[in-house]
A protein has these predicted regions:
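C-terminal structural segments of small proteins and small subunits
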Residues: 55-84
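A short, structured beta-strand/loop element
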Residues: 15-51
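Local beta-strand/beta-hairpin segments that build beta-sheet-rich folds
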Residues: 1-6
Length: 84
């Protein structure tokens, strides 16, 4: 699964295989925790990311949601700037 961003120990990835991976989403991994977030409404689909890490992921998503949606639609992965 390609890593598209890394910040504060949080790994953001994106992977899809046609309709098998809908709805559009990204997994976020922090240590042994993982959550999946919708690119449609930025709501957590599932997972157990700690609250502090989840807030950072959502803040980052707000800044880059258009890029994330474009990447999902085009299936063209690139690195996105980390949260600073």
């Amino acid at each position: 699964m390609p890593t598209i961003a890394l910040f504060y120990g949080i790994i953001i990835q994106m992977y899809f295989l046609s309709s098998e991976h809908n709805p559009p989403h990204i997994p976020a991994i922090y240590n042994d925790h993982k959550s999946t977030y919708s690119l449609i409404d930025m709501i957590k689909i599932n997972g157990d990311l700690p609250i502090k890490a989840e807030k950072l992921v959502l803040e980052w998503m707000k800044l880059h949601i258009d890029e994330l949606r474009e990447m999902w639609d085009s299936q063209s992965f690139k690195r996105i700037e980390p949260l600073e």
